[in-house]
A protein has these predicted regions:
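Conserved PLP-enzyme active-site core in the AAT-like
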Residues: 1-205
Length: 205
């Protein structure tokens, strides 16, 4: 493939996935992070180098932007930042993917101003992390882009991502998302994490 994904240099897919993206014949184009985040301006410059170049055959085509929420450094994107990044994605016809392995903790943070509905409206793919948010295993992927929905299950099958007992995975999320249990669990964890942070701060650590 000649397509690539734009991500922060600290992005999980760039550092902790044993070159899984590259193993599918795609390239990761990294951008220097600031506290784990990248900006719409940076993404615009990176994508523009291809889409506005007279000789694009010499480059990979940026087709997706990868964000983590929260980031690998525990920081959060604001709604304003997410909207700005969405605008750049629309400008160049790129997909926006949000890694939600710790989504619940980000949503429950006091300073957060992004809702699940915002993610659904502004991203092409995001997911509810389960493994790190109270489930035994697995993640619940939400695909909002009709382009990406087509044949997605076939791609899962081709890449060994279909579980024979997959309903057990779904049952976890059925329970976690019922009556907002998922958000209760993660918000409680946020409160406790802030207590630990405050204790360190009092000790000057």
């Amino acid at each position: 493939s000649v397509q690539s994904v734009i991500a922060a240099d600290t992005g999980h897919i760039n550092c902790h996935e044993a070159a899984s993206v590259e193993n599918t014949n795609h390239k990761i184009q990294t951008i220097p992070n600031t506290d784990g985040k990248i900006t719409a301006t940076q993404i615009d410059a990176c994508a523009g180098a291809y889409y506005e170049e007279n000789e694009p055959e010499y480059y990979t085509e940026p087709k997706m932007v990868y964000l983590s929420f929260p980031t690998e450094q525990g920081t959060l994107y604001s709604l304003e930042e997410l909207k700005a990044i969405r605008e750049v994605c629309d400008k160049y016809g790129m997909y926006l993917f949000v890694d939600g392995a710790r989504l619940g903790y980000g949503l429950g943070a006091v300073e957060n101003d992004i809702s699940v509905e915002d993610f659904a409206a502004l991203t092409d793919v995001f997911y509810f992390g389960g493994t790190k948010c109270g489930a035994l295993f697995g993640e619940a992927v939400v695909i909002t882009s009709n382009d990406l929905k087509r044949r997605f299950k076939a791609f899962m099958k081709q890449n060994g991502a279909v579980l024979a007992k997959g309903w057990l995975l779904g049952l976890q999320f059925y329970t976690l998302l019922e009556n907002d249990l998922y958000f209760e669990i993660t918000k409680k964890a946020d409160v406790l994490a802030m207590k630990i942070r405050d204790a360190f701060a009092k000790k000057g650590i």
